[in-house]
Amino acid sequence: MSDQITVDELWAECEQTFEDLFLNLKKGLSRKRYMEIYTKIYNYCSSANEKALIDFYIPKVKVLVAQKAVEIMSRSESYPNDALLLFFRNQWNEWKMSSNVLKNLLSPVNKIHSSDKKTTSSSANQNESVVYSDTLNSWRETAFNPLKNKLSVSLLQIIKNDRTGFSTNLQVLSDSLECYVQLGPEKNKLEIYQSCFEQQFLQETETFYKAESADFIEKNGVCEYMRHVYNRIEQETNRVNQYMPISTLEKLTKILNNVLISNYKEQFASKFLDILIEDKSSDLVMMYSLLSRVNHLTPLKNIFSDFIKSEGLKEIESNLKEAQEKPQVLISILLKIYSRFNIMIKECYGNDTDFTTAMDKSFSILVNENPASYDPKKKESNIPVVLSKFCDQILRKGPHHISDEAELEKKLTEAVCLFKYLPDKDIFMLNYQKMLSKRLVEDLSASEDAETLMINKLKNYQGFDYCTKLTRMITDMRLCKDININFQNHLNEKSLTLPYQFNFYVLTNGSWTLTNKQTATPFKPPSEMLSSITYFESFYKKSYQGRVLTFLYDFSRADVDSRQAKGKIYKLTTTAYQMAILLMFNGADKITRFLINDTIGLDETSIRLPLLALIKTGIIECSEPSFKNWNNDTEFTVNSKFSSKKMKVSCNIAVQIGETKQSEGQQTVSEQEIEKERFFKLQAAIVRIMKSKKTMTHNDLTVETTTQVSKWFTPKITAIKKAIEYLIDQEYIRRTTDDNPSARKYEYMA
């Protein structure tokens, strides 16, 4: 091409611009001039003479860059350390700008040069600008290496000034350290930074904080020291994140943890109990945060666990009498302790599962072995009964019921939280079931929705099987409404009228803990009841063929109007037996015990409680104050002077017989009932296991049985053995006849 310029001509066009870039940057480079130079270089490289350009240009550029580096070095000698660092930073920033502009202008040359340098290597430096690389090398060899020690000392002084509270220019730190990284070889860009700065920085950091920490904790104590450490770690972390390569953070953190925390971890832990007692949540957060960095939380967990027990016991012992007598007091104390430390775990220990486990362990001991509910002689706790009574109180009508739905749900949720700590969940369930029965059949439940809510909460925690009977009880009560409506429709169709208003509960056998007591003679309902019972029995048998009704008179209730001499009418809430006794007074002013026995059919023991309760209420009177002296001729009369502030009077009250108070419906489940239920559960578990496994050794069967029933209770080995022997007698399982006793197994008999 006739218009192609030579290499010398091209250099003559570019030389002054290149010199200005490095030696007179303030002169600037216009966009127009930039494009002129770039176009000429590009056009030349597009011709056949590009190799000549490379051979000519690269050495000249290297010389120019080296000249600039020498100039910077010579000027730097006149600056002291602090001023030198600023000078170096400014020259480095200008150098970067000049190098980048030069790199872009010579990019066509670089592309050719890079293509000539290609090898089979896939390393990242294949395509690096040779021009930019040369400028970095010149800077490193001529300007950086002679000054690096002075620069590093100045940089470390900046950090020391920052640590000790003197004002300083941290941006200089960032820019200078960027230079350290940029000058590193491509294979390890951090090599120069690590060898020339980082290593010394970490050593000085360790030295600085060893001295400061020892002095500070001695003068200010642990709590102030923790706050100081917390702030120091935050400052150091922020400085690294903002001004240094992130790789330094892990190394720095290790030093800080060791010097500031590990060296004083025992002093931290020894102060933990005082902080707990003083309830300084901010200090708890700091101590947990700091000691978790050095994996020294075990002493804290142990102290925390012991503290929960001591605080709970202190609270219970200060209210011991009330806690023993009133379920709501003991449960409220336990819930208060649970809530307090559960919140502490969330807010101070980041929901740490190890602290939660420690709390569960100590709180379980507090729940089950507290002095208000634990009997050390029997080694038993009645907390399952107490918790069931607490639930009964808030779910039934009365002063303890919570009408606010949100608050009620909160209390039920808290009750289930305590429930999970019960080892004998079967005792809770048996008592809860019995109390639910009473609430439902006596119309004492405040809300069906609340009852269902509690059952669902238990179901969610313990499983569907645990609550099967409870669910069935609620279902029965719903069905009873339909049955009574249908019965009334039946009476209307037959033009029949009952002498009194009746409501019948038809309950599924097996789901309810309701059975009549065994008596020598059966109860004979009074005529006022008998016709209604007969009508309903006839209706039910026709509607539900094959079903058998058993009337539970022990649990039947009645409202009886009592008209006094002055015309005042009281509504008496009575048991069926009390109602039968009171109705006898409609025909006589006095009746003997013999007449009562003969009329209602019960023996003298069975009528004792109903009579004593009526006497205690003041409805009737007896000439013989002590029931021990009663005989067949003992007379009972209506108290014509009876009066009460309440128009509705409950006659089913507890009375003192011997050393205990009794009522017609025992509130809690007896030990015999518990043992009977457990024996049944053990049998059922063993049969299920053997039906599945077919053959098992005694030890394996014992272990598997324990596992299956453990969600209800922890069985005794003797109880399991007794259940096995019973099932052998009933021919559900049998022993093999192996000659070696240790090899004998149990076999399932289909």
Curated annotation (Swiss-Prot):
Pathway: Protein modification; protein ubiquitination. Gene3D superfamilies: Cullin Repeats, Cullin, Chain C, Domain 2, Winged helix-like DNA-binding domain superfamily/Winged helix DNA-binding domain. GO terms for molecular function: ubiquitin protein ligase binding. GO terms for biological process: protein ubiquitination; ubiquitin-dependent protein catabolic process. Keywords: Isopeptide bond, Ubl conjugation, Ubl conjugation pathway. GO terms for cellular component: cullin-RING ubiquitin ligase complex; cytoplasmic SCF ubiquitin ligase complex. It holds the Pfam family Cullin. InterPro entries: Cullin, Cullin_homology, Cullin_homology_sf, Cullin_N, Cullin_neddylation_domain, Cullin_repeat-like_dom_sf, WH-like_DNA-bd_sf, WH_DNA-bd_sf. Transmembrane segments: none annotated. This is Cullin-5. It comes from Dictyostelium discoideum. The gene is culE.
